[in-house]
Amino acid sequence: MLKMQRSQQRVALMMLMVVAAVHCQESESRRAVTEHQLMHDRGRSIQSLKRLIWLSSAIEGLHTAQARTLEPDSRWRSRGAQLYSQPGREESSGGQKRALETLLSDLYRAHLTFGLGEPEK
């Protein structure tokens, strides 16, 4: 009887060990799938970054804007003068007219400076 209980205990212990080993292998395979997904996402992120860098360099190579004369600046000034000379508008003082011309020319120059970047030395 005592031998039978010991053999039953051994069988139970063996089954417990087998179940524990199977359970550990399942969690490892799940972890492997998670790690696989993580590596896949990392690869996609790296590929996206490389594509962004390539696109940025391609756009820099396509930039064809050249420094232009300030001829468009004179168009802005003439447009400002036309606005003040329209009938029905009150006569403005010379200071306001100069302020408008300065504002328009500063806006245009800032746009040119931003679009062209820093001048090369």
From Swiss-Prot:
GO terms for molecular function: hormone activity; peptide hormone receptor binding. Residues 1-24 form the signal peptide. Residues 25-29 form a propeptide. Its main location: secreted. One of its GO terms (cellular component) is extracellular region. SMART domains: PTH (SM00087). Pfam families: Parathyroid. Keywords: Cleavage on pair of basic residues, Hormone, Neuropeptide, Secreted, Signal. GO terms for biological process: adenylate cyclase-activating G protein-coupled receptor signaling pathway; bone mineralization; neuropeptide signaling pathway; osteoblast development; regulation of bone mineralization; regulation of chondrocyte differentiation. Residues 77-97 are annotated as: Disordered. Specifically expressed in a bilateral cluster of neurons in the dorsal region of the periventricular hypothalamus. Their axons project through the midbrain and hindbrain and down the spinal cord. It is found in: Secreted. Induction: Up-regulated by runx2a. Belongs to the parathyroid hormone family. Neuroendocrine peptide which is produced by a subset of neurons in the hypothalamus. Activates the G-protein coupled receptors pth1ra, pth1rb and pth2r with similar affinity. Receptor binding stimulates intracellular cAMP production. Plays a role in bone mineralization by regulating expression of factors involved in phosphate homeostasis. Important for embryonic bone development. This is Parathyroid hormone 4. It comes from Danio rerio (Zebrafish). The gene is pth4.
